[in-house]
Structures are given as C-alpha cells and as structure tokens.
A protein has these predicted regions:
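Short beta-strand-to-loop acidic/aromatic patch adjacent to the donor-nucleotide binding site
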Residues: 76-87
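Active-site donor/metal-binding and catalytic loop motifs
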Residues: 185-208
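Short beta-strand-to-loop element that shapes/binds the nucleotide-sugar donor at the catalytic cleft/hinge
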Residues: 106-124
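Short, acidic, metal-binding catalytic loop of nucleotide-sugar glycosyltransferases
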Residues: 25-34
Length: 227
C-alpha cells in the first residue's frame, strides 16, 4: 500500500454516464485502490475504490467540474480530473504520477495525459521521428500553453475555476494558471478518449455559445482570439 495515494482523488463530472462503466472498469484495474473516486452525476461506483457520488447541478462543463473539484479540494491537496469518456491503459496512472514527481520543482499547474482524440501537441499523432509504431516524442514530457485535462493532475494551490461554458473553458483556465505563475505540461501518460459524449457533437452550437459568453464577459480575449 502506498499511503500517499490516500491523499489523492480522481474527480469526474458526467451528465449521461454512457462511458462511465468502461472508465470505472479501467480505474478498478489500473489505479491503486487507495485512491478515492468522486463522481458527480451518477450513482455508479467502482468495485475496488471508495467512491463518493454527488449530484451534478451544473449547466455546462465549467460549472459541473467547478462544483465537484471544490468539494474534492476540501479533503485532498491534489486531484486527478478525468473526463467521463476516457479509458485508462495499464500505464496511464503510473506514468502520470512518475512525471509529476519529476516535475515537482517546476511550479506545476496542469500535468495532463496524451490521447488519440485531443487537439494540438497533446495528440499522440503528432511527432517527427518514429520509434517502431510510436513517435519518439510520445516518451517526452513537454510544456504547453494550453491543454485539455482529459486525465490531468493539479494541486489545490494551482487550481483556478473554469468559466461557465463548455468549449474554451480549459483554454481560458490554462492561460489564467500560467498568468498566476504556474506551468502546464503534457505527460508521457496516455488515455483513450471517445470524445464529445457529454457536450455533444453539435460543434457549431458549442462554439457559438462559448463565443457569446466570452464576448460578453472577456471582450479583450474575444477580440484577440476571434476578431
């Protein structure tokens, strides 16, 4: 038993819970049982882990995760935020923790897993040099301005609440975390991501709703990004 894992929780918010049984099966298989799981929006429990089930009263991604993260940080100094539509591999958790230890003196904000359904350099399809069927870059930790925390670890000190929107909430949060003096990193860890199972596949709707909020509340950022 690793006593340090008793001070760590995996935090999930869900609306439909379509993929939650598979995620929980992978947590049960690959995550030490000392880690607590906190899920908002479902009564489903992991079979091997202490599971705390909460309501999900948020109207969007930002509100839903803010609520459950605040709850978790009342008990835990650091948490792993997980999307409800990912699947862990045998090394997802272990590599994330190993990389966090390696970066312990780097003013760590987000440290997030790579995936097959994610934008930018966090996607495993990015790379220049092959090593067998993988890219060499997949075995490297690197810094990034903006990340998608599909499976990412963060401390209570570094956390900043999401804006109350679906799209762009993680972009804005990452920028604010960097402005507060922390650095965001991509881990060597990998998770499979189904994608868009909670916010839906109507990309135009998600884009328009987020842009409307940003324009009304963060006009300078709106003009920088979208004008």
């Amino acid at each position: 038993m690793n006593d340090s894992y008793a001070n760590l929780a995996i935090v999930i918010a869900t609306k439909h819970a379509k993929c939650l049984p598979v995620l929980f099966a992978s947590i049960d298989e690959y995550v030490p049982k000392e880690v607590t799981v906190i899920v908002a929006g479902s009564d489903l429990e992991c079979s091997r882990h202490n599971t705390i089930c909460l309501p999900n009263n948020g109207n969007n991604y930002g509100e839903s995760y803010n609520d459950v993260v605040r709850y978790a940080f009342e008990m835990y100094p650091e948490i792993i935020v997980a999307n409800d539509d990912i699947v862990l591999t045998p090394s997802s958790f272990d590599l994330l923790i190993e990389d966090k230890i390696l970066l312990s003196h780097h003013s760590l904000g987000w440290l997030c897993s790579r995936s097959d359904y994610v934008r930018g350099l966090q996607n495993i399809r990015n790379g220049e040099v092959r090593n067998g069927i993988k890219f060499v870059e997949e075995n490297q930790i690197f810094q990034s301005d903006v990340l998608s925390p599909l499976f990412g670890i963060i401390s209570r000190e570094a956390w900043i609440d999401y804006k109350p929107i679906n799209w762009y909430s993680d972009d804005i949060q990452c920028l604010e975390i960097r402005a507060a003096g922390y650095n965001n990193y991509v881990s060597r860890s990998y998770v499979h991501h189904v994608g868009s199972q909670t916010v839906g596949m109507d990309h135009q709707k998600n884009d328009n709703e987020a842009k409307t909020w940003i324009k009304a509340n963060m006009l300078e950022l709106y003009e920088l990004w979208f004008s």
